[in-house]
Amino acid sequence: MSQAYSSSQRVSSYRRTFGGAPSFPLGSPLSSPVFPRAGFGTKGSSSSVTSRVYQVSRTSGGAGGLGPLRASRLGATRVPSSSYGAGELLDFSLADAVNQEFLTTRTNEKVELQELNDRFANYIEKVRFLEQQNAALAAEVNRLKGREPTRVAEIYEEELRELRRQVEVLTNQRARVDVERDNLLDDLQRLKAKLQEEIQLKEEAENNLAAFRADVDAATLARIDLERRIESLNEEIAFLKKVHEEEIRELQAQLQEQQVQVEMDMSKPDLTAALRDIRAQYETIAAKNISEAEEWYKSKVSDLTQAANKNNDALRQAKQEMMEYRHQIQSYTCEIDALKGTNDSLMRQMRELEDRFASEASGYQDNIARLEEEIRHLKDEMARHLREYQDLLNVKMALDVEIATYRKLLEGEESRINLPIQTFSALNFRETSPEQRGSEVHTKKTVMIKTIETRDGEVVSEATQQQHEVL
């Protein structure tokens, strides 16, 4: 609006000064005034007005098909003046003011075009950079989509197979250790049962030994009693012998007295035979009693001796059995201690294996969780790259639209600058023809819009759309 207003002011000033309207095409923006030829004074003298005309040329550049605009200053041209009618005077001060205003406007437009040119070049460089980054991201997305998941899946499956194999090996080892432990527990139970049996046998042997000791004590007491009885019998035998001898002496004395009386009394009957018979009977009875007593004593002594020998043999056998039982108990105790040590070592090894198995299992679970986390991270990163790719596509589309808008603005600015210069074609000014400008400006551009919809890192749908633009 400000440019249009300043342009209308310049036209009004020109009309006030030169009394005529410049020849502009209908609808073209006012860029530079055209000074008609005019005559000065009545003398028909001619003068010239210096006019600076700018030509805008375009060189084809970069990716968008447009290059930076360049304003080149034409050399100063002397415009011959034609003689005005009589009485017409040219106000040079007003023309200089208008010319100065025109130069100021053209300078501002040149600066503005230079800024637009720089901005346009920056946008083109940014578009190139974004296209390169877009291509790199697309290649990375394709690489991640085509290779990494497969490789990660292969590595994941391989590690899972290895972990399963190790778990099976550890399970087999644990089962084998459990079987060995059960066997050792069975052996231990059997040895404990055998130990209990041996302890019972030991108790029975001790009980038998105690009974044998009681029998030995009873036999000893019986032997002592028999010895005392033998002594008493010996004393009784000695006493009976003495009594018998006394009786014999008394009988002999009586016999002698009787013999004396018989000799003295021949008429008395003979008693010697009767005494002799009685003596013989007593001697027979005494010898029989002595022999019976000796036989009974000998039989009792032999019985007691045999019983003592039997008891001694039983005691010795009991002692031997007790010694053997003690040795067996000691050997069983040593064997039990060794088995206890073996059992403790096996239990310790089993606990170590269980701890190692638990630690390895936790490590494998951590590895599985880490691999799953890496897979989720890769999926999230892939989704992020896809979103960035979609955002870059959107930014690229927006930049394409903005570039097209700037291109149209620049084309309008070129047409606004170039159209006033076309009015000076009679003066043989060098300018670019509209056909060349059209051939330089109008280029065809194809924009491919690829829409990728993702959900949880997975590609759900893809859509491709092509737009053809004529620039």
From Swiss-Prot:
Residues 439-454 are annotated as: Interaction with CRYAB. The modification Phosphothreonine is found at T17, T77. Residues 289-296 are annotated as: Linker 2. Residues 269-416 are annotated as: Interaction with NEB. Signal peptide: none annotated. Residues 414-471 are annotated as: Tail. Residues 2-109 are annotated as: Head. GO terms for molecular function: cytoskeletal protein binding; identical protein binding; structural constituent of cytoskeleton. The modification Asymmetric dimethylarginine is found at R37. Residues 254-269 are annotated as: Linker 12. Keywords: ADP-ribosylation, Cell membrane, Coiled coil, Cytoplasm, Intermediate filament, Membrane, Methylation, Muscle protein, Nucleus, Phosphoprotein, Ubl conjugation. Belongs to the intermediate filament family. This is Desmin. It comes from Sus scrofa (Pig). The gene is DES.
